[in-house]
Amino acid sequence: MTYGIVIVSHSPEIASGLKKLIREVAKNISLTAIGGLENGEIGTSFDRVMNAIEENEADNLLTFFDLGSARMNLDLVSEMTDKELTIFNVPLIEGAYTASALLEAGATFEAIKEQLEKMLIEK
């Protein structure tokens, strides 16, 4: 079982900046980050999210998002891919960074999930 990280943001700059930050502590994990629409504007796109999921080399993906439609697109993609997605409702930067660092260090999925549960955003 291989695990990877997927980041979905409405902003191309947030997605690329967070990916760059994560690469400082997690150089070897499978990481994809998508932000914005096809034309570079703010928003999310089902097709771009699906591509980010499919481009990730891992079979089991820990996914992180910034706002509502990013979550909605992850939910839709999770129904249409063979990959196993776990969608975390945690702060995007802190959650993705923590999960990536732990994954790089060889932590189990359960250990990562336990750490992220402390960050859960209540509805």
UniProtKB/Swiss-Prot annotation:
Any GO molecular function: ATP binding
Record pathway: Polyol metabolism; glycerol degradation
Catalytic site positions: H10 (tele-phosphohistidine intermediate)
Gene3D superfamilies: Phosphotransferase system, mannose-type IIA component
The protein's enzyme class: transferase
Keywords: ATP-binding, Glycerol metabolism, Kinase, Nucleotide-binding, Phosphotransferase system, Transferase
Catalysed reaction, written as an equation: dihydroxyacetone + phosphoenolpyruvate = dihydroxyacetone phosphate + pyruvate
Parts forming coiled coils: none
EC number: 2.7.1.121
Induction (free text): Induced by dihydroxyacetone via the DhaQ-DhaS complex.
Boundaries of every PTS EIIA type-4 domain copy: 2-123
InterPro entries, A to Z: DhaM, DhaM_N, PTS_EIIA_man-typ, PTS_EIIA_man-typ_sf
Note: Unlike the carbohydrate-specific transporters of the PTS, the complex DhaKML has no transport activity.
Name the record gives this protein: PTS-dependent dihydroxyacetone kinase, phosphotransferase subunit DhaM
Organism: Lactococcus lactis subsp. lactis (strain IL1403) (Streptococcus lactis)
